[in-house]
Protein backbone atom coordinates (compact mmCIF):
# COMPACT_ATOMS: atom_id res chain seq x y z
CA UNK A 1 0.00 0.00 0.00
CA UNK A 2 1.19 3.52 -0.76
CA UNK A 3 2.69 5.30 2.20
CA UNK A 4 0.73 8.21 3.56
CA UNK A 5 2.12 11.55 2.47
CA UNK A 6 1.77 15.02 3.87
CA UNK A 7 -0.32 16.96 1.39
CA UNK A 8 1.65 19.65 -0.37
CA UNK A 9 0.23 22.81 -1.83
CA UNK A 10 0.21 22.76 -5.62
CA UNK A 11 2.72 25.57 -6.09
CA UNK A 12 3.78 24.21 -9.48
CA UNK A 13 0.62 25.63 -11.01
CA UNK A 14 2.16 29.07 -10.55
CA UNK A 15 4.94 28.11 -12.98
CA UNK A 16 2.45 27.98 -15.84
CA UNK A 17 1.71 31.10 -17.89
CA UNK A 18 -1.37 33.06 -16.73
CA UNK A 19 -3.50 31.76 -19.62
CA UNK A 20 -2.81 28.14 -18.64
CA UNK A 21 -3.34 28.87 -14.94
CA UNK A 22 -6.71 30.41 -15.69
CA UNK A 23 -7.82 27.36 -17.69
CA UNK A 24 -6.65 24.94 -15.00
CA UNK A 25 -8.43 26.83 -12.22
CA UNK A 26 -11.59 26.80 -14.33
CA UNK A 27 -11.29 23.01 -14.65
CA UNK A 28 -10.78 22.63 -10.88
CA UNK A 29 -13.95 24.66 -10.46
CA UNK A 30 -15.89 21.91 -12.26
CA UNK A 31 -14.88 19.43 -9.57
CA UNK A 32 -16.00 21.84 -6.87
CA UNK A 33 -19.37 22.21 -8.61
CA UNK A 34 -19.76 18.42 -8.57
CA UNK A 35 -18.65 18.28 -4.92
CA UNK A 36 -15.60 16.17 -5.85
CA UNK A 37 -12.61 16.85 -3.60
CA UNK A 38 -9.97 14.53 -5.07
CA UNK A 39 -8.86 12.82 -8.25
CA UNK A 40 -6.47 9.88 -8.65
CA UNK A 41 -4.71 9.36 -11.98
CA UNK A 42 -2.70 6.20 -12.70
CA UNK A 43 0.05 6.50 -15.33
CA UNK A 44 1.17 3.24 -16.98
CA UNK A 45 3.05 2.00 -20.04
CA UNK A 46 6.37 0.64 -21.23
CA UNK A 47 9.66 2.12 -20.04
CA UNK A 48 11.18 5.12 -21.79
CA UNK A 49 7.93 6.45 -23.23
CA UNK A 50 7.80 9.63 -21.11
CA UNK A 51 5.55 8.72 -18.18
CA UNK A 52 7.58 10.54 -15.51
CA UNK A 53 8.21 13.54 -17.75
CA UNK A 54 4.48 13.83 -18.37
CA UNK A 55 3.78 13.74 -14.62
CA UNK A 56 6.30 16.55 -14.10
CA UNK A 57 4.82 18.61 -16.93
CA UNK A 58 1.32 18.25 -15.50
CA UNK A 59 2.39 19.17 -11.96
CA UNK A 60 4.65 21.99 -13.10
CA UNK A 61 7.62 20.77 -11.07
CA UNK A 62 10.12 17.90 -10.97
CA UNK A 63 8.12 15.59 -8.76
CA UNK A 64 8.90 12.27 -10.47
CA UNK A 65 12.42 11.04 -11.17
CA UNK A 66 13.26 10.86 -14.87
CA UNK A 67 15.89 8.21 -15.67
CA UNK A 68 16.95 8.68 -19.28
CA UNK A 69 19.96 6.36 -19.30
CA UNK A 70 19.21 4.14 -16.30
CA UNK A 71 16.68 1.37 -15.84
CA UNK A 72 13.57 2.42 -13.95
CA UNK A 73 13.05 1.32 -10.37
CA UNK A 74 10.21 -1.04 -9.56
CA UNK A 75 8.48 1.13 -6.98
CA UNK A 76 5.69 3.48 -8.08
CA UNK A 77 5.69 7.13 -7.02
CA UNK A 78 2.66 8.93 -5.60
CA UNK A 79 2.60 12.66 -6.28
CA UNK A 80 -0.13 14.50 -4.35
CA UNK A 81 -0.86 18.20 -4.62
CA UNK A 82 -3.70 20.26 -3.17
CA UNK A 83 -5.25 23.49 -4.38
CA UNK A 84 -8.34 25.30 -3.07
CA UNK A 85 -9.54 22.22 -1.19
CA UNK A 86 -8.99 19.88 -4.15
CA UNK A 87 -6.37 17.10 -4.09
CA UNK A 88 -4.75 15.78 -7.26
CA UNK A 89 -3.04 12.38 -6.92
CA UNK A 90 -0.88 11.16 -9.79
CA UNK A 91 0.77 7.73 -9.57
CA UNK A 92 3.84 7.28 -11.74
CA UNK A 93 4.68 3.61 -12.35
CA UNK A 94 7.74 1.72 -13.60
CA UNK A 95 7.94 0.37 -17.14
CA UNK A 96 6.20 -2.96 -17.56
CA UNK A 97 8.77 -4.61 -19.84
CA UNK A 98 11.95 -6.31 -18.64
CA UNK A 99 14.17 -8.37 -20.93
CA UNK A 100 11.61 -8.45 -23.71
CA UNK A 101 8.76 -9.71 -21.52
CA UNK A 102 6.09 -8.27 -19.25
CA UNK A 103 7.53 -7.88 -15.76
CA UNK A 104 5.03 -9.67 -13.51
CA UNK A 105 6.90 -8.48 -10.44
CA UNK A 106 6.36 -4.85 -11.47
CA UNK A 107 2.64 -5.51 -11.99
CA UNK A 108 2.31 -7.09 -8.53
CA UNK A 109 4.23 -4.25 -6.86
CA UNK A 110 1.97 -1.68 -8.56
CA UNK A 111 -1.18 -3.52 -7.45
CA UNK A 112 -0.02 -3.74 -3.83
CA UNK A 113 1.02 -0.09 -3.90
CA UNK A 114 -2.52 0.81 -4.97
CA UNK A 115 -4.27 -1.28 -2.29
CA UNK A 116 -7.38 0.51 -0.95
CA UNK A 117 -7.03 3.31 -3.50
CA UNK A 118 -9.52 4.17 -6.24
CA UNK A 119 -8.36 4.81 -9.80
CA UNK A 120 -10.40 7.58 -11.40
CA UNK A 121 -8.41 7.80 -14.63
CA UNK A 122 -5.79 5.62 -16.34
CA UNK A 123 -3.31 7.32 -18.67
CA UNK A 124 -1.78 4.70 -20.93
CA UNK A 125 1.38 6.30 -22.31
CA UNK A 126 3.32 5.54 -25.48
CA UNK A 127 5.35 7.50 -28.01
CA UNK A 128 3.99 9.13 -31.13
CA UNK A 129 7.30 8.86 -33.00
CA UNK A 130 7.23 5.06 -33.28
CA UNK A 131 6.24 3.44 -36.54
CA UNK A 132 4.78 0.10 -35.57
CA UNK A 133 3.13 -1.93 -32.85
CA UNK A 134 4.14 -5.46 -31.90
CA UNK A 135 3.21 -8.33 -29.64
CA UNK A 136 4.84 -6.62 -26.64
CA UNK A 137 2.23 -3.87 -26.88
CA UNK A 138 -0.52 -6.47 -26.73
CA UNK A 139 1.17 -8.18 -23.79
CA UNK A 140 1.37 -4.92 -21.83
CA UNK A 141 -2.30 -4.14 -22.46
CA UNK A 142 -3.19 -7.72 -21.52
CA UNK A 143 -1.20 -7.47 -18.28
CA UNK A 144 -2.98 -4.24 -17.28
CA UNK A 145 -6.32 -5.86 -18.09
CA UNK A 146 -5.50 -8.98 -16.06
CA UNK A 147 -4.43 -6.79 -13.14
CA UNK A 148 -7.38 -4.38 -13.01
CA UNK A 149 -10.09 -5.82 -15.26
CA UNK A 150 -11.23 -4.70 -18.70
CA UNK A 151 -13.46 -2.03 -17.17
CA UNK A 152 -10.38 0.09 -16.47
CA UNK A 153 -10.20 0.93 -20.17
CA UNK A 154 -13.52 2.75 -19.86
CA UNK A 155 -11.70 5.15 -17.53
CA UNK A 156 -8.63 5.54 -19.72
CA UNK A 157 -6.94 7.76 -22.28
CA UNK A 158 -4.14 7.01 -24.73
CA UNK A 159 -1.36 9.57 -24.22
CA UNK A 160 1.21 9.96 -27.02
CA UNK A 161 4.41 11.77 -26.09
CA UNK A 162 7.03 13.38 -28.38
CA UNK A 163 4.22 15.11 -30.24
CA UNK A 164 6.57 17.84 -31.55
CA UNK A 165 7.48 15.37 -34.25
CA UNK A 166 8.01 15.70 -37.98
CA UNK A 167 6.85 12.56 -39.82
CA UNK A 168 9.35 11.15 -42.33
CA UNK A 169 9.15 11.43 -46.11
CA UNK A 170 6.89 14.44 -45.98
CA UNK A 171 3.95 12.51 -44.51
CA UNK A 172 1.04 14.65 -43.35
CA UNK A 173 1.23 15.17 -39.57
CA UNK A 174 -2.47 14.66 -38.88
CA UNK A 175 -2.53 11.55 -41.06
CA UNK A 176 0.44 10.09 -39.17
CA UNK A 177 -1.15 10.86 -35.78
CA UNK A 178 -4.39 9.20 -36.88
CA UNK A 179 -2.57 6.11 -38.19
CA UNK A 180 -0.44 5.73 -35.07
CA UNK A 181 -3.40 6.32 -32.73
CA UNK A 182 -5.65 3.83 -34.52
CA UNK A 183 -2.94 1.16 -34.46
CA UNK A 184 -2.54 1.50 -30.69
CA UNK A 185 -6.28 1.70 -30.06
CA UNK A 186 -6.69 -1.55 -31.99
CA UNK A 187 -3.98 -3.11 -29.81
CA UNK A 188 -5.87 -1.98 -26.70
CA UNK A 189 -9.10 -3.44 -28.06
CA UNK A 190 -7.54 -6.83 -28.86
CA UNK A 191 -5.17 -6.97 -25.88
CA UNK A 192 -7.98 -6.12 -23.45
CA UNK A 193 -10.35 -8.49 -25.28
CA UNK A 194 -12.92 -5.73 -25.66
CA UNK A 195 -15.93 -6.85 -27.68
CA UNK A 196 -18.25 -4.62 -29.69
CA UNK A 197 -20.76 -4.52 -26.86
CA UNK A 198 -17.97 -3.44 -24.48
CA UNK A 199 -17.20 -0.48 -26.74
CA UNK A 200 -20.75 0.80 -27.03
CA UNK A 201 -21.26 4.29 -25.67
CA UNK A 202 -17.62 5.19 -25.14
CA UNK A 203 -14.33 5.69 -26.95
CA UNK A 204 -10.80 6.00 -25.61
CA UNK A 205 -9.60 9.58 -26.18
CA UNK A 206 -6.15 10.26 -27.61
CA UNK A 207 -4.06 13.02 -25.99
CA UNK A 208 -0.88 14.44 -27.53
CA UNK A 209 1.92 15.59 -25.24
CA UNK A 210 5.29 17.31 -25.73
CA UNK A 211 7.45 17.40 -22.62
CA UNK A 212 10.70 18.72 -24.08
CA UNK A 213 11.94 22.29 -23.82
CA UNK A 214 11.67 22.65 -27.59
CA UNK A 215 7.88 22.56 -27.47
CA UNK A 216 6.46 25.46 -29.45
CA UNK A 217 4.54 28.20 -27.64
CA UNK A 218 1.74 30.54 -28.59
CA UNK A 219 1.51 34.28 -28.05
CA UNK A 220 0.32 33.62 -24.48
CA UNK A 221 3.50 31.62 -23.77
CA UNK A 222 1.54 28.35 -23.53
CA UNK A 223 3.07 25.11 -24.76
CA UNK A 224 1.26 24.09 -27.92
CA UNK A 225 1.06 21.14 -30.29
CA UNK A 226 1.70 21.44 -34.05
CA UNK A 227 -2.07 21.88 -34.47
CA UNK A 228 -1.95 24.95 -32.19
CA UNK A 229 -3.69 23.34 -29.18
CA UNK A 230 -2.40 24.26 -25.73
CA UNK A 231 -1.71 20.72 -24.59
CA UNK A 232 -1.59 20.99 -20.78
CA UNK A 233 -5.14 22.41 -20.41
CA UNK A 234 -6.27 19.96 -23.11
CA UNK A 235 -4.86 17.05 -21.08
CA UNK A 236 -6.66 18.25 -17.95
CA UNK A 237 -9.89 18.69 -19.90
CA UNK A 238 -9.72 15.12 -21.19
CA UNK A 239 -8.94 13.78 -17.72
CA UNK A 240 -11.96 15.66 -16.37
CA UNK A 241 -14.23 14.27 -19.10
CA UNK A 242 -13.08 10.73 -18.29
CA UNK A 243 -13.58 11.18 -14.55
CA UNK A 244 -17.19 12.28 -15.18
CA UNK A 245 -17.99 9.88 -18.05
CA UNK A 246 -20.43 7.82 -15.99
CA UNK A 247 -18.32 4.67 -15.88
CA UNK A 248 -17.33 3.28 -12.51
CA UNK A 249 -13.90 4.09 -11.07
CA UNK A 250 -11.69 1.10 -10.23
CA UNK A 251 -11.32 0.40 -6.52
CA UNK A 252 -8.23 -1.67 -5.72
CA UNK A 253 -9.27 -3.96 -2.88
CA UNK A 254 -7.59 -7.02 -1.38
CA UNK A 255 -9.47 -9.39 -3.68
CA UNK A 256 -8.23 -7.54 -6.76
CA UNK A 257 -4.65 -7.51 -5.47
CA UNK A 258 -4.47 -11.15 -4.35
CA UNK A 259 -6.94 -12.67 -6.79
CA UNK A 260 -9.79 -15.06 -5.92
CA UNK A 261 -9.39 -17.09 -2.71
CA UNK A 262 -8.46 -20.63 -3.83
CA UNK A 263 -10.15 -22.10 -0.72
CA UNK A 264 -13.42 -20.38 -1.56
CA UNK A 265 -13.14 -21.59 -5.13
CA UNK A 266 -12.54 -25.12 -3.83
CA UNK A 267 -15.62 -24.96 -1.59
CA UNK A 268 -17.76 -24.04 -4.58
CA UNK A 269 -16.40 -27.03 -6.50
CA UNK A 270 -17.15 -29.64 -3.81
CA UNK A 271 -20.93 -29.97 -4.58
CA UNK A 272 -20.11 -30.23 -8.27
CA UNK A 273 -17.58 -32.97 -7.60
CA UNK A 274 -20.11 -34.97 -5.56
CA UNK A 275 -22.74 -34.56 -8.27
CA UNK A 276 -20.21 -35.64 -10.87
CA UNK A 277 -19.26 -38.69 -8.78
CA UNK A 278 -22.89 -39.70 -8.27
CA UNK A 279 -23.93 -39.35 -11.90
CA UNK A 280 -20.89 -40.92 -13.51
CA UNK A 281 -19.76 -43.44 -10.87
CA UNK A 282 -22.25 -44.29 -8.12
CA UNK A 283 -25.47 -44.31 -10.15
CA UNK A 284 -24.19 -46.69 -12.86
CA UNK A 285 -22.66 -48.91 -10.14
CA UNK A 286 -25.95 -49.20 -8.22
CA UNK A 287 -27.79 -49.92 -11.47
CA UNK A 288 -25.31 -52.68 -12.32
CA UNK A 289 -25.63 -54.30 -8.88
CA UNK A 290 -29.43 -54.35 -9.11
CA UNK A 291 -29.21 -55.89 -12.55
CA UNK A 292 -26.87 -58.62 -11.31
CA UNK A 293 -29.17 -59.40 -8.39
CA UNK A 294 -32.21 -59.72 -10.62
CA UNK A 295 -30.42 -62.10 -12.99
CA UNK A 296 -29.01 -64.32 -10.19
CA UNK A 297 -30.76 -67.77 -9.95
CA UNK A 298 -32.64 -68.38 -6.71
CA UNK A 299 -31.29 -71.06 -4.29
CA UNK A 300 -33.12 -74.43 -3.86
CA UNK A 301 -34.39 -73.69 -0.35
CA UNK A 302 -36.01 -70.47 -1.60
CA UNK A 303 -37.67 -72.36 -4.46
CA UNK A 304 -38.89 -75.11 -2.05
CA UNK A 305 -40.32 -72.57 0.39
CA UNK A 306 -42.05 -70.66 -2.36
CA UNK A 307 -43.53 -73.97 -3.70
CA UNK A 308 -44.95 -74.94 -0.30
CA UNK A 309 -46.42 -71.53 0.11
CA UNK A 310 -48.21 -71.79 -3.22
CA UNK A 311 -49.67 -75.26 -2.42
CA UNK A 312 -51.03 -74.06 0.93
CA UNK A 313 -52.74 -71.19 -0.75
UniProtKB/Swiss-Prot annotation:
The chain crosses the membrane at residues 269-286. The keyword Nucleotide-binding applies. This is Translocase of chloroplast 34, chloroplastic. GTP binds at residues 48-53, 67-72, 162, 210-211. Residues 92-95 are annotated as: G3. It is a single-pass membrane protein. Mg(2+) binds at residues 52, 70. Its cofactor is Mg(2+). Residues 67-70, 127-132 are annotated as: Homodimerization. Residues 210-212 are annotated as: G5. It comes from Arabidopsis thaliana (Mouse-ear cress). Keywords: Acetylation, Chloroplast, GTP-binding, Hydrolase, Magnesium, Membrane, Metal-binding, Nucleotide-binding, Plastid, Plastid outer membrane, Protein transport, Receptor, Transmembrane, Transmembrane helix, Transport. A motif (AKR2A-binding sequence (ABS) required for chloroplast outer envelope membrane targeting) lies at residues 287-295. Its EC number is 3.6.5.-. The lineage of its organism: Eukaryota, Viridiplantae, Streptophyta, Embryophyta, Tracheophyta. The gene is TOC34. Residues 161-164 are annotated as: G4. Mostly expressed in roots and flowers, and, to a lower extent, in seedlings, stems, and leaves. Residues 45-52 are annotated as: G1. Residues 36-260 form the AIG1-type G domain. Belongs to the TRAFAC class TrmE-Era-EngA-EngB-Septin-like GTPase superfamily. AIG1/Toc34/Toc159-like paraseptin GTPase family. TOC34 subfamily. It is found in: Plastid, Chloroplast outer membrane.
